[in-house]
């Protein structure tokens, strides 16, 4: 059965793993910072991007689409954030990213057992860009993670 607390813990650890990796290998000069406000609808940012991470327990191509809550996009639209919006997906076979494009997704209602009907964004996996297979949703925090995370 789905457990909210365990799901949140799992997600928070994966956020640190991904931000550490991205700061080491991609955003060396403009490091990503995790939001400390737990009420934020997105996970991290720097001067260039706003990022959201979804961690999955399947391979990237297990389904024709991947999804996340529409509240993430709605928040960024409402905030009128001018940075690039990137949605990262940590699958069992690697880290992928989708850069927001209003023509590359659809919104459909999803019946959540505990939360009722919620709008979800569905993105065709053909729009996902593979970043690396060096980290997966099964990865652990590296020993030097604190050197790369705010």
Language model segments and positions:
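Catalytic cores of nucleic-acid endonucleases
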Residues: 2-9, 54-104
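Short glycine/proline-enriched coil/turn segments at helix->beta-strand junctions
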Residues: 27, 46-49, 81-85
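Beta-rich catalytic cores
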Residues: 40
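Well-ordered beta-strand positions
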Residues: 43-45, 90-91
């Amino acid at each position: 059965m789905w457990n909210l607390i365990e799901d949140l813990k799992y997600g928070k650890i994966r956020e640190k793993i991904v931000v550490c990796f991205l700061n080491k290998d991609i955003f060396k000069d403009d490091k990503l910072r995790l939001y400390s406000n737990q009420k934020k609808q997105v996970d991290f940012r720097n001067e260039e991007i706003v990022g959201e991470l979804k961690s999955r327990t399947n391979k990237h191509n297990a389904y024709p689409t991947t999804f996340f809550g529409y509240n993430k996009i709605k928040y960024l639209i409402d905030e009128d954030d001018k940075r690039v919006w990137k949605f990262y997906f940590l699958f069992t076979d690697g880290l992928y990213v989708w850069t927001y494009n209003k023509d590359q997704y659809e919104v459909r209602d999803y019946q959540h057992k505990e939360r009722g009907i919620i709008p979800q964004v569905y993105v065709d996996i053909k729009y996902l860009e593979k970043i690396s297979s060096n980290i997966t949703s099964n990865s652990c925090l590296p020993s030097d993670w604190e050197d790369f995370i705010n």
